[in-house]
Amino acid sequence: MYSLNPSQIEASNLLYQVSSVEVGKHLYWQLGMFQVHGQVLITSWVVMAIIIITSVIASRNLQPIPSGTQNFLEYVLEFIRDLTKTQVGEEEYRSWVPFVGTLFLFIFISNWSGALIPWRLIELPSGELAAPTNDINTTVALALLTSVAYFYAGLSKKGLSYFGKYIQPTPILLPINILEDFTKPLSLSFRLFGNILADELVVAVLISLVPLVIPVPMMLLGLFTSGIQALIFATLAAAYIGESLEGHH
């Protein structure tokens, strides 16, 4: 009978630890006829609370010469304003700063929460806590909100003539132009979801294999890529809105 030597047993144990890293474990809440992912709602509420509390603290005692939290908040708002102005256009950007800013801050803090907050230490009846953007439902919802926003932008400015863009520069391109508007939210959602999920899985696997050494630089890299993903999503959302306002691709 074949028996494993100690090195093979150790290798088997490591493989078992890696295989225990699962995707798709959820805590389901029943809301009427629908089942929702409870852990996503919990972490989303935490992220929204962080944004609201920070905003209230920074703006409760505004000073002509900003300092501390107010200074940081004004820097963030200036960055978001410049981003929106560049993508949407100087004439139309002001009304879209709150939308683009909310998208950016929610995604940014959600992504960072996955790397900085030890969600998995909090035990649930089933499933486990993770960054809200680690769930495809969250990223699809954000992408659909972006789709609604750029359709609203085009229709509010041009009315029904907005749909004339689908036959530009030639009616032959009608199916392709329609398909493009469907692929925009898909590309936004899958890009964000894939990057955040991959980052968390890589860190989880490395922690199971080398608990102390390798995961730290990978977590730092994850923080950087998480910020980049938030910037890409907000930039593309603003660019799509700008395209709708201009009336062409």
Curated annotation (Swiss-Prot):
PANTHER family hit by this protein: ATP SYNTHASE SUBUNIT A, CHLOROPLASTIC
Keywords: ATP synthesis, CF(0), Chloroplast, Hydrogen ion transport, Ion transport, Membrane, Plastid, Thylakoid, Transmembrane, Transmembrane helix, Transport
UniProt similarity note: Belongs to the ATPase A chain family.
Membrane spanning stretches: 38-58, 97-117, 136-156, 201-221, 222-242
InterPro entries given in the database record: ATP_syn_F0_a_bact/chloroplast (IPR045082), ATP_synth_F0_asu (IPR000568), ATP_synth_F0_asu_AS (IPR023011), F0_ATP_A_sf (IPR035908)
Subunit structure of this chain's protein: F-type ATPases have 2 components, CF(1) - the catalytic core - and CF(0) - the membrane proton channel. CF(1) has five subunits: alpha(3), beta(3), gamma(1), delta(1), epsilon(1). CF(0) has four main subunits: a, b, b' and c.
Compartments it resides in: Plastid, Chloroplast thylakoid membrane
Protein name (database record): ATP synthase subunit a, chloroplastic
Keyword Membrane: yes
GO MF assignments: proton-transporting ATP synthase activity, rotational mechanism
Topology of the protein relative to the lipid bilayer: Multi-pass membrane protein
Gene Ontology CC: chloroplast thylakoid membrane; plasma membrane; proton-transporting ATP synthase complex
Gene source species: Chlorokybus atmophyticus (Soil alga)
HAMAP family: ATP_synth_a_bact
Signal peptide: none
Domain of life: Eukaryota
